[in-house]
Amino acid sequence: MVVPEEVSHFRPINLCNVTYKIISKIMVNKLKLLMAKLISPYQNAFIQGRNIFDNILLAHEIIDTLKKKTDRKKGYGALKVDMCKSYDRVSWNFLKTVLISMSFGNYWVHRIMECVSSMQYALLLNGSPTHTFLPTRGVRQGDPISLYLFLLCANILSIALIQG
């Protein structure tokens, strides 16, 4: 967008110190090893050994099959979920519950929640920064660990949709 017209059109800039980046990278390297075991086989993006293109092909096959269905009495359907700005909406309490339910240890849960909740925001108004304020939800965009935390939360949605 060339000229933003609403606050929602702005995207935050992720500024982290070197120590945070090192800690985050170490945690990501450990999380990567677990993701294939923790995440549903239907989630293919960003999981080692899986390919996102598999889901694209599957989606095309499903749509093609739905178009060919002649039995209108049975309920067939497809659902497309718009994940727009979903990083900003991840509940920290939900994330903590997900981590605990997936048997992450107290040390890991505490460290991850420290990473998530340590961010602050400030706005530039007429070139001058405002006072900082603290968010109560969301994960940092551009932070490598945020991707994996988001996948863990989105996996719960995937499971709920599958189970009906």
Predicted regions and their residues:
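Nucleotidyl polymerases of mobile genetic elements and RNA viruses
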Residues: M1-G164
